Amino acid sequence: MRYNEKELQALSRQPAEMAAELGMRGPKKGSVLKRRLVKLVVNFLFYFRTDEAEPVGALLLERCRVVREEPGTFSISFIEDPERKYHFECSSEEQCQEWMEALRRASYEFMRRSLIFYRNEIRKVTGKDPLEQFGISEEARFQLSGLQA
């Protein structure tokens, strides 16, 4: 997927849902753990050298898996290439859990599933579609296969 570098840099300067200095090791063999400022903005995980304002890189948190590894560590891998893992080391187990939960909730797919779930729950209680007043109908983009209303 292609991105506009200036737009990504602008996004990286937006307020973060979470930010912390974490140990980070990239997916290349022989990669060493480095301290990085890691910043979660919408569904992007930006990582910076601790003394620089521009990101070194960014991970789009779509179609990815966040997995606990050893105590205080987790990894992110992508469905298309599960062997390519980014490893993160936190200062505590509590911080690790917070990051893992935030990263799992950051994807568009998670938000879409949540929208569908709550839309259906409200419809069950009220008998009305809560999005209808905004001109949003039963569009295919909100539907999941096998989901019952």
UniProtKB/Swiss-Prot annotation:
Tissue and organ distribution: Expressed in testis and liver.
GO terms classed as biological process: endosome organization; receptor recycling; retrograde transport, endosome to Golgi
Record-linked InterPro entries: Boi1/Boi2-like, PH-like_dom_sf, PH_domain
Transmembrane segments: none
Domain PH: 15-108
PROSITE patterns, per database record: PH_DOMAIN
Highest taxon, organism lineage: Eukaryota
Any one Gene Ontology cellular component term annotated for this protein: recycling endosome
Name by which UniProt lists this protein: Pleckstrin homology domain-containing family J member 1
Species this protein is from: Homo sapiens (Human)
Record gene name: PLEKHJ1
